Amino acid sequence: MLEQMGIAAKQASYKLAQLSSREKNRVLEKIADELEAQSEIILNANAQDVADARANGLGEAMLDRLALTPARLKGIADDVRQVCNLADPVGQVIDGGILDSGLRLERRRVPLGVIGVIYEARPNVTVDVASLCLKTGNAVILRGGKETCRTNAATVAVIQDALNSCGLPAGAVQAIDNPDRALVSEMLRMDKYIDMLIPRGGAGLHKLCREQSTIPVITGGIGVCHIYVDESAEIAEALKVIVNAKTQRPSTCNTVETLLVNKNIADSFLPALSKQMAESGVTLHADAAALAQLQTGPAKVVAVKAEEYDDEFLSLDLNVKIVSDLDDAIAHIREHGTQHSDAILTRDMRNAQRFVNEVDSSAVYVNASTRFTDGGQFGLGAEVAVSTQKLHARGPMGLEALTTYKWIGIGDYTIRA
C-alpha cells in the first residue's frame, strides 16, 4: 500500500512543481470552499472520533486537540485562504551573479518534492500541512493518529475532490488510514519517495524517527516552555502575560509549563500569583521554597516532583520554582528546556539581552507570552510544525521551510578553463 502511495506522491510532485502561483492559489481557494461546503461530513466524522476517544479514556487535553467545531473548521478554511495571500517562495532567486568565466549563476528556490508528516490527534494539521505543501509545490503523505482516523479520511477526501476538480492528481495529498503502527516504521524507510519527514508528537515518536528513519527528519513540537520573572518585573503586567501563556489554550506546545521566579521578588509576587491562578483554575506544582508561601494562598498547590520539570503538562498545571538569579534561571532552562519557547519578564534590558543571547531556544521573548510561537502569529501563515532543531529550519515552519534550492548556471556554450 505505502509503495503505491509513494509512487503516486512522487508523480504528483513533478506536476505540482510546474504550477504557477496563480494555479496553486486557485487550488487552495477551491479547498477552502469545499471544506465549508462539506463541513457537515467532516464534523460528523469528527464527532465519532471524539466519542470513541472519550470512551477509550483519552485525556481532556488530547480531546481538546482532537475536537472540531463549526467555528474551528471555518477558521481552518480561512487559514487556507490566508495561505493564498502569502508570497510564493518557489522560483525566488536567493542570490547570484556573473562569474569570471562569463557563466551567469543563480541560486533559486524549488520545492522539496514529497513531504511525510506523522502527527497525533490534531485534525487541523491535516489541512494546515496540505495547504502549505501545495503552495510550495510539494506532494504530501500524512499519517495521523488513530484517534483522528475518520476525521482525516473525510478531510483528505474533500481535499482530493478539490484537487481533481482543478485537474490535479489525488496523489498530491494522501493519508495513511490504516492505524497499524508497523506502517510508521515502513514509512520511515521510504527514502525512495519521501524527501523530508516531520514527526509531530511525543518524545517516543521523535526517538523512533531518529533511530529508524532513512529520510531526513525535522523534529520539534515538544514544548516545555519557561517564563523567568526577573526581580525588576512589573508584577501586575507579568501576571497578565503568565495567564495568557498558561490558560489561553493549555493543550498547545507553546503554553508555559514552568515559571521561574527570582528570589528577590518572590515575597511580593507569589501571593499575587496564587490569587490569579486560583481565579484561572491552575494547579501549581511548587518547589520547597515556593511551597511554603503558596500554601497560604487560594490556589491549589502541590509539591513538585523532580521529573515534572521535564513534563509537557498540556493542561492547567504549572511548575513554580524560586531561583537565585538570572544565571540560575538560564541553567534550569538549559537542563530542562526543549529549545521551543522561553521568555523573560523584566525592566532590566541588560538582563533581557543576556537572556536572549544565552537561552538557546527556537523562540526567545522579552516581556511577551510564549503563545506567540505560531506560524500565523509570525506572519508565516499556517505552520507545518515548530522545529526545535538547528539544521534546515528552526521555529515555526512556514513556506520557505518547505523549499530547498538549486544552482542554475546559464552560459553561452561556456566551458571551464
UniProtKB/Swiss-Prot annotation:
Protein keywords: Amino-acid biosynthesis, Cytoplasm, NADP, Oxidoreductase, Proline biosynthesis
Primary localisation category: cytoplasm
EC supergroup of this enzyme: oxidoreductase
Catalytic activity: L-glutamate 5-semialdehyde + phosphate + NADP(+) = L-glutamyl 5-phosphate + NADPH + H(+)
Gene Ontology biological process terms from the UniProt entry: L-proline biosynthetic process
Task of the protein: Catalyzes the NADPH-dependent reduction of L-glutamate 5-phosphate into L-glutamate 5-semialdehyde and phosphate. The product spontaneously undergoes cyclization to form 1-pyrroline-5-carboxylate.
Alphabetical list of HAMAP family matching this protein: ProA (MF_00412)
Protein name per Swiss-Prot or TrEMBL: Gamma-glutamyl phosphate reductase
Record organism: Shigella dysenteriae serotype 1 (strain Sd197)
